Regions:
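Conserved beta-strand-loop surface patch within small alpha/beta domains used
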Residues: 1-113, 122-215
Length: 215
């Protein structure tokens, strides 16, 4: 089954490249990939949680074509819940896709699924034949990407379709960009890997109150 969500691509003249960025690796000319810092940080927290088990997630954002330049802006990540085991590895099931669609509407309106994450702590950030097969089945757009992660050795890499669309290849690099990104902040509070939202809110409130004896 092919899953589609609204807002698959945009061509907007008013779009501007992120200004505050950190380059990771080389520059990928075929597709400029920008991942927001809150997303990047959250994915590492998510990957390390639960005893370092294998995890999947969806990447959400927008795709742009501007003056011949193809740009992928990744502004959010959604945990993959209700995954299924296929051939000894985790995969999105029908329940997973339904959950992602609901979270997309709740937290990331106007965005679409632009790729997915496969985190296998301690196994590197390599592309496997099973990952490529899954990607080609469910992520058919030539701008949809796979982000492979190893949170133990802190290794990661993006994979994208090659020029003729016959398979995936490793991206030469990507950019981490910095933004206020309220959508991802809200998602992180409700899906914290560190502490529940209520506890985080209590700590934040306490920090804002004046200390006894303070002038």
């Amino acid at each position: 089954m092919q899953y589609q969500f609204d807002g698959e691509r945009e061509r907007r003249a008013e779009f501007a490249m992120p200004k505050r960025t950190k380059q990771m690796g080389g520059i990928e000319q075929r597709l400029r990939i920008f991942v927001e810092d809150y997303v990047y940080t959250y994915l590492y927290q998510y990957g390390k949680s639960g005893g370092g088990a294998e995890k999947l997630a969806a990447l959400v954002g927008k795709y742009y074509e501007l003056e011949g330049q193809r740009v992928l802006l990744i502004s959010g990540a959604i945990q993959a819940k209700g995954t299924v085991q296929e051939g000894g590895t985790e995969r999105f099931g029908d329940e997973t896709w339904e959950y992602i669609g609901g979270q997309l509407q709740q937290y990331f309106k106007g965005m679409t699924v632009v790729g997915w994450v496969h985190c296998q702590p301690g196994f590197g950030a390599f592309l496997t034949a099973k990952d490529e097969q899954f990607h080609r089945e469910y992520f058919k757009e030539d701008w949809q990407v796979l982000f492979a992660m190893d949170t133990v050795d802190r290794l990661d890499s993006f994979y994208l379709y090659n020029e003729d669309g016959s398979g995936l290849r490793q991206a030469r690099g990507y950019f981490v960009y910095y933004d206020r990104n309220r959508e991802m902040q809200e998602y992180m509070l409700d899906n914290s890997m560190i502490r529940p939202r209520e506890e985080a809110a209590e700590i934040e409130t306490a920090a804002e109150q004046p200390k006894e004896g303070a002038k």
